[in-house]
């Protein structure tokens, strides 16, 4: 191993690092970013960062090897062109939603697929997932379901009190 080029060692480290990230992530989405400006990519990175997600741009060969090492399948024929991987560490839908919003805003951004719950998701499934509210939105919906009956009782009691007060 003494004659191994430093670039090969570096690439192996990149593959191992990315494979670990993919294994520990909740979900990730692969998309072709060709045509996005630096400002667009920075804005996407900021949105992803706010939900504890990250954007990685790697060579396709390194990405393919990381997928293989992490046990990810479904992207075998998808890694052509300049691709990026948005990885969600906490909220499963956050990265998928952010990239899907960018793809809807810019027609030239092509989503290749996503990986969620150890399954490949195609673009049709991604559209369905992106329609789901985020974790905070779901919490607020759940909270409103709990508070609605109490609110109705309060309004009823207030109406009865007003009638008796007249």
Curated annotation (Swiss-Prot):
SUPFAM superfamilies: Ribosomal protein L10-like (SSF160369). Keywords: Ribonucleoprotein, Ribosomal protein, RNA-binding, rRNA-binding. It holds the Pfam family Ribosomal_L10. The keyword Lipid metabolism does not apply. GO terms for cellular component: large ribosomal subunit. Signal peptide: none annotated. CDD domains: Ribosomal_L10. InterPro entries: Ribosomal_uL10, Ribosomal_uL10-like_sf, Ribosomal_uL10_bac, Ribosomal_uL10_bac_type, Ribosomal_uL10_CS_bac. One of its GO terms (biological process) is translation. The keyword rRNA-binding applies. PANTHER family: 39S RIBOSOMAL PROTEIN L10, MITOCHONDRIAL. Part of the ribosomal stalk of the 50S ribosomal subunit. The N-terminus interacts with L11 and the large rRNA to form the base of the stalk. The C-terminus forms an elongated spine to which L12 dimers bind in a sequential fashion forming a multimeric L10(L12)X complex. Forms part of the ribosomal stalk, playing a central role in the interaction of the ribosome with GTP-bound translation factors. Belongs to the universal ribosomal protein uL10 family. This is Large ribosomal subunit protein uL10. It comes from Ureaplasma parvum serovar 3 (strain ATCC 700970). The lineage of its organism: Bacteria, Bacillati, Mycoplasmatota, Mycoplasmoidales, Mycoplasmoidaceae.
């Amino acid at each position: 191993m003494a004659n191994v080029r430093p670039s090969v060692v570096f690439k192996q480290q990149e593959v191992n690092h990315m494979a670990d990230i993919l294994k520990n992530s909740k979900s990730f989405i692969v998309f072709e970013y060709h045509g996005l400006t630096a400002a667009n990519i920075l804005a996407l990175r900021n949105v992803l960062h706010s939900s504890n997600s990250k954007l990685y741009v790697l060579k396709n060969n390194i990405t393919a090897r990381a997928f293989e090492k992490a046990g990810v399948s479904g992207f075998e024929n998808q890694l052509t062109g300049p691709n990026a991987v948005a990885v969600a560490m906490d909220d499963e839908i956050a990265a998928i939603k952010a990239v899907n919003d960018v793809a809807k805003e810019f027609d030239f951004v092509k989503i290749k697929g996503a990986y969620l719950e150890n399954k490949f998701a195609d673009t049709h499934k991604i559209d369905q997932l992106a329609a789901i509210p985020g974790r905070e939105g779901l919490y607020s919906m759940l909270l409103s379901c709990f508070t609605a009956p109490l609110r109705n009782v309060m309004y009823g009691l207030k109406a009865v009190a007003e009638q008796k007060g007249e």
